[in-house]
Amino acid sequence: MSKAMPMAACAMAGVKQMQSLTLPWPSKDLSPNARVHWTRRSKAVKQARGYAEVMARRAGWSGLSLPVEGRLDLWISFYPPTRCLPDDDNMLARFKPYRDGIADALGIDDRRFVSHPLIEDEVRHAGQVVITITGITQQASNGGPRLHAHPAF
């Protein structure tokens, strides 16, 4: 289901889909519910952000030619390590350092991302997060979002 949503959005707008980036399940120390010392949390944030940046660069995302304005749709599929499904708001908070690292690799501010989180039912060993960036979203004249095709996608 997670793959269908980005592809459907791309097909409607005539936007090509970027390749996916797979990252490990975020550390429990990044959870807003975690009761850990601030230095431990800070270390987990730094490690996750750096790892996401390196992996995004290895995937070739740093060489993309992005427009100066517009928002990027960030499709995030969370594949939990167990059948116990986490809350999507908790997972977005745990994902934030990854999001920052991807933005660092792209050379943009992470506020340009429009997040589309999906907690998958499929269990994957050790858990995974699959990220796909699809289109450029800009505000339409009627106030609603619209997708624009861009040659980089």
UniProtKB/Swiss-Prot annotation:
Gene3D superfamilies: Holliday junction resolvase RusA. Keywords: Endonuclease, Hydrolase, Nuclease. One of its GO terms (molecular function) is magnesium ion binding. One of its GO terms (biological process) is DNA repair. InterPro entries: RusA-like_sf (IPR036614). The keyword Hydrolase applies. The keyword rRNA processing does not apply. Signal peptide: none annotated. It comes from the Bacteria. Belongs to the RusA family. This is Uncharacterized protein PD_1345. The lineage of its organism: Bacteria, Pseudomonadati, Pseudomonadota, Gammaproteobacteria, Lysobacterales.
